[in-house]
Curated annotation (Swiss-Prot):
NCBIfam families linked: PRK05472.1-3, PRK05472.2-1, PRK05472.2-2, PRK05472.2-3, PRK05472.2-4, PRK05472.2-5
Keywords assigned by UniProt, alphabetized: Cytoplasm, DNA-binding, NAD, Repressor, Transcription, Transcription regulation
Protein name per its UniProtKB record: Redox-sensing transcriptional repressor Rex
Similarity comment text for this entry: Belongs to the transcriptional regulatory Rex family.
Organism (species): Desulfitobacterium hafniense (strain DSM 10664 / DCB-2)
GO molecular function: DNA binding; DNA-binding transcription factor activity
InterPro entries given in the database record: CoA-bd, NAD(P)-bd_dom_sf, Rex_DNA-bd_C_dom, Tscrpt_rep_Rex, WH-like_DNA-bd_sf, WH_DNA-bd_sf
Amino acid sequence: MKTLKIPEATIIRLSVYSRHLTDVDRKGIVTISSGDIAEGVGVSPAQVRKDLAYFGEFGTRGVGYNVKDLHRHILKILGLSQDWSVCLVGMGNLGLALTTYKGFRERGFIITSIFDNDPQKIGTTVNGVEVLPVDRLEEVAKANKTQIGIISVPSPYAQEIADKLISAGVQAILNFAPVVLNVPPEVELRNVDLAVNLEVLTFNVGTRRA
C-alpha cells in the first residue's frame, strides 16, 4: 500500500471518524455500523466503507465494527499511536490560542517548546511550557527531538523560522503565516490561511444566492 495514493479527503475524513469513535466509545457503545458512522459525521455509508477499504478489511458483515478496534486501527493509520513533539513559534493571539488548545494533547501532539522575540513574553509560562527566545530555536528543538513545528509569526519572518525548523530536523511544518514557504521535499508542509478559508465560504454563499 502506497500512502501517497490515498486521497487527502480520505485522510481528513478518517480524522473525523476517529473523533466520532472517541465520542461513541465514551458512551459505552461496543459495535457500530458504517451507517451509524455516516450518520454521525454527515457522509454516506458507502463513503465510510470506501475510505476504510483503502487500508484493509475491518468489521464483520452484518455485525459492524468493534468501536475500540476500529478506533485503534484509524489512530495507527493517522500516526497517532505515538506522541509527537511539537514546537510553536510566535506567541501572538493565534499562538496563544494554539498553545492552550486541549485537543492537541488529547490527540498526542505535545507542545514541548514555545518561542517568541517579544521580551515581555520571553520567560513567561504557558501551559507549563516556558516561552524562549527565537535564537534558541534550533538548539532546543534538536534537544527535544521535535518532529513538528508550528509557525504563527508575521509573514516577513516565516521563511526564516521555517529554515531554523528545518535545520533543527523537524519532519513537518504547519504554517499559519499567509506566505509561500520554500521547504525541501522531505519536509511535509501544511499551510493554513484563515482568510482563504473565509473567502471560500463567501464564494460558496454568493454562488447559492446567484
